[in-house]
Amino acid sequence: PLAILSASLSIMHPSLYNASHQAMQQLSEWSATNDPKMAAALRHWPTIYTNISMIANRSAPLHRDLQSHADWYDMLVSVSNYSECVLDIPSLGLQFDYWPGTVVAFSGRLLRHGVNDVSGNCCSLAFYMRDNIHNWLGVPRSDWMRVPLVSQALAGM
């Protein structure tokens, strides 16, 4: 199922997908020589994103994700069994029902966001990339996503 996130990113932000794909390839090549345990783990890594964090049974006050880059899309995936959770993005004046199974992609650095405290077992997975990993690997940073880039990507399919 996590391959769907990577495939979604390839449509929503093709240049970010390509940059991350290049980063993961280079990381695999580097680790094959320098860190066999990392190489073994990367063979089973489920997504194009370089980082995954799990947030369990807690609210997330409004914040920005400063380790990411403003023009990159992070993905939040909610799982578990809970109700009445709201994802708040106040700078856009948006509040979303954040039910189990919801996937949201946006710039976690650019947009302040947070979720309320809920009853039940609440778990979210945050998929993101770290600028320092891309810089260390020498992978060029992707550009801002623009509508013409999506049109070009879809035309090439």
Q: For the regions a protein language model found, what residue spans apply to each?
A:
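Conserved, well-structured core segments
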Residues: 74-76
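Catalytic core of Fe(II)/2-oxoglutarate
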Residues: 71-72, 81-157
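Conserved, ordered domain cores of eukaryotic regulatory proteins
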Residues: 1-70
